[in-house]
């Protein structure tokens, strides 16, 4: 069995373990400040490292927790991560994170679904501060200011709305990183989480190209991108190439599921989409499946559909998963036992499981 098969089979079991676990709230309290950073670390590059260092210096006596997706190893774009989350967690702790916890299965969810899950995780962690990188954009500073005033900011198609005041703050399509910030504000407001003065906004640094890093991973040559990533990331990518799962899929699973499942039952697939794909059966290879998927609103739509065909989660199960999330907190890596004890006293759940 391949590494990818082992990971995806295990993660399907873990998904249903989450689903079967009852939420248990904790009565513990702690004045210790917790900084929770959602980040994919795909892989951990200088931009991530800069954000971590700024957050740590802003709240020096704090617990830095990285929330790293997650089950099925598929990114928000629906494509396979470069490294499994355990390796990403290892790199993060070596560079300054205190604890890394498992985030939601981004690549199998719609953007609103995983944004809601992440915000529920922030609440469960009893988060005091949330660092977030952003790209400077005309008019965006006012949006950031409103968010840190605790206003309910919501992204709409080609505009950003302050739902607290009813104003349209921006008429434009946001870049992905900036969109995530407004989506967080919207989801945090929906669950009643008070985020006034809790965001630490960090201006993105230059000199990092995700495209070039992915090309280097594909080619196995990192000399051209060594200045974009910390030495630890380069070390893992160079010395542990067997762990690299980038661009790898279980093609046979995708083809078999596309041919045989009732696609309308799966998360992300509505009646129209399911019928359109099913009408082009049978499929003999991955390209035929990919070509049968119409282009959606998102540029990454096709890859997300491939991911759900690869790891078929029914709509009902995903809905129940989101409703209970996080039914347990899985720790992927932690700095030491003292940090772990502080973490357990801080968070709002008794269901804490460590893979260490």
Positions of predicted regions on the chain:
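Conserved structured core elements
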Residues: 46-49, 86, 179, 207
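Active-site cores that bind ATP or allylic diphosphates and position pyrophosphate for catalysis
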Residues: 2-32, 78-79, 95-356
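N-terminal catalytic cores of NTP/NDP-binding nucleotidyl/phosphoryl-transfer enzymes
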Residues: 20-84
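Short, structured active-site "lid" loops
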Residues: 85-97
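Generic structural signal for well-ordered alpha-helices
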Residues: 52-53, 89, 119
């Amino acid at each position: 069995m391949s590494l990818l098969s082992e990971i995806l089979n295990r993660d399907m079991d873990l998904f249903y373990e989450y689903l079967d676990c009852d939420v248990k709230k904790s009565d513990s309290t702690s004045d210790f400040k917790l900084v929770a950073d959602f980040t994919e670390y795909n892989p951990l590059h200088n931009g991530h490292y800069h954000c971590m260092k700024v957050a740590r210096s802003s709240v020096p006596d704090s617990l830095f927790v990285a929330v790293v997706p997650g089950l099925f190893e598929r990114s928000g774009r629906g494509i396979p991560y470069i490294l499994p989350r355990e390796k990403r967690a290892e790199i993060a702790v070596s560079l300054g994170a205190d604890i890394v916890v498992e985030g939601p299965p981004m690549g199998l969810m719609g953007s609103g679904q995983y944004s809601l899950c992440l915000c529920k995780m922030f609440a469960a962690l009893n988060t005091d501060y949330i660092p977030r990188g952003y790209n400077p954009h005309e008019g965006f500073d006012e949006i950031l200011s409103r968010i840190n005033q605790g206003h309910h900011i919501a992204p709409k198609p080609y505009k950003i709305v302050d739902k607290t005041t009813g104003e349209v703050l921006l008429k434009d399509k946001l870049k992905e990183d900036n969109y995530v910030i407004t989506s967080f504000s919207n989801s945090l407001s929906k669950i009643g989480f008070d985020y006034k003065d809790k965001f630490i906004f960090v201006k993105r640094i230059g000199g990092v190209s995700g495209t070039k890093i992915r090309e280097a991973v594909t080619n196995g040559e990192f000399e051209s991108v060594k200045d974009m990533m910390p030495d630890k990331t380069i070390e893992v990518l160079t010395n542990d190439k067997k762990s690299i799962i980038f661009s790898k899929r279980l093609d046979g699973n995708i083809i078999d599921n596309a041919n045989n499942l009732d696609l309308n039952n799966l998360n992300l697939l509505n009646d129209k989409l399911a019928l359109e794909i099913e009408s082009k059966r049978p499929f003999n290879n991955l390209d035929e499946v990919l070509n049968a998927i119409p282009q959606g609103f998102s540029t990454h739509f096709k890859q997300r559909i491939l991911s759900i065909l690869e790891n078929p989660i029914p709509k009902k199960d995903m809905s129940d998963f989101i409703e209970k999330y996080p039914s347990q907190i899985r720790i992927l890596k932690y700095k030491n036992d003292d940090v772990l004890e502080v973490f357990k006293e801080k968070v709002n759940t008794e269901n804490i499981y460590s893979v260490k």
